[in-house]
A protein has these predicted regions:
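Alpha-carbonic anhydrase
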Residues: 1-290
């Protein structure tokens, strides 16, 4: 059953952690921005290695879309804007959308600075529908934009926007000041699209930055369900031993102390025995001379 999606803790059907694991390692990019009237679309360079693994599938970045106001509802209402990053699977299939709300606030972060530069660049060089501009942004990377915080997930089967959606909550929103929010509203208009999807799940772990961690699979289940389906594969990582790790291991230190104590005891035994024999021999010589 599909419903209108409202990103809120009260609407969570269950927890989805390992199957919904989102691992990323984005590289930097040069981007071109296009003003499409209802959305600002940005290109993104892809590295030689797919930057994202989601549910054991590798993805590359297709494009970034910035909407104002947001497409999703957050706790019953829309936010000032929303950044949606579209990914396409290397092996083919439905896209993966990673969505980050944008709110008006004076709080500042690297993501705030980068997004502000995008909006200012489009406002200055591509203010009208159909305009494009090259964004010469230093250090522009999704690695600094996507939050490393818990997120929600759901599947959307609506024609044209079908795929898996990962949506960060309002507490993880990118903060933009009032002037920049006003500027954004002057160069694009609202995109009247309701986000429809299946049950809303929650991943409390958040993403990480290791695209090679594919050791475990678990299906999404409602909270409290005992019929979870788990397939586990052995991780390929092997332990690495070095002198530092050995010296910091209490077991190894205990064994080392025993060995050193034994060596010291044997050494002392031979030294004392040698001294005893030496003085015994000296005593015999003295007695014989007498």
């Amino acid at each position: 059953m599909t419903t209108k999606i409202d990103i809120s803790p009260k609407n969570v059907y269950g927890k989805c952690d390992l199957k919904c694991a989102y691992n990323f390692n984005y590289s930097g990019s040069n981007s071109t921005a296009k003003n499409n009237g209802i959305v600002i679309s940005l290109t993104y360079d892809n590295s030689s290695v797919p930057p994202v693994i989601y549910n054991n599938q590798k993805y590359t970045v297709s494009k970034l879309n910035l909407y104002s106001p947001s497409l999703h509802l957050f706790n019953g209402s829309k936010t000032n804007a929303e950044l949606i990053v579209e990914h396409v699977p290397v092996a083919g299939g439905d896209p993966l959308y990673v969505c980050v709300p944008v709110i008006q606030s004076n709080n500042s972060s690297t993501a705030s600075s980068l997004l502000t530069q995008v909006i200012q660049g489009v406002s200055s060089n591509a203010p009208s529908n159909g305009d494009s501009t090259n964004l010469n942004l230093s250090g522009f990377t999704l690695q600094d934009i996507i939050p490393k915080k818990p997120y929600y997930s759901y599947a959307n089967t609506t024609s044209g926007v079908s795929g898996d959606y990962l949506v960060f909550g309002k507490f993880e929103a990118i903060a933009i000041d009032e002037k920049t929010i006003t500027t954004l509203g002057e160069i694009i208009t609202e995109f009247p699209l309701d986000m429809i999807g299946d049950k809303l799940f929650y991943n409390p772990n958040g993403p990480n930055s290791d695209v090679g961690n594919q050791g475990i699979y678990i299906s999404c289940q409602p909270t409290g369900s005992s019929e979870e389906k788990i397939d586990v594969t052995m991780a390929k990582n092997q332990p690495i031993y070095d002198l530092s790790s050995i010296l910091n291991n209490p077991i190894y230190l205990f064994i080392l102390q025993i060995i050193l104590g034994g060596v010291l005891f044997i050494t002392l035994f031979f030294v004392i025995n040698y001294i005893f024999k030496y003085f015994s021999a000296s005593s015999k010589v003295s007695n014989s001379n007498s």
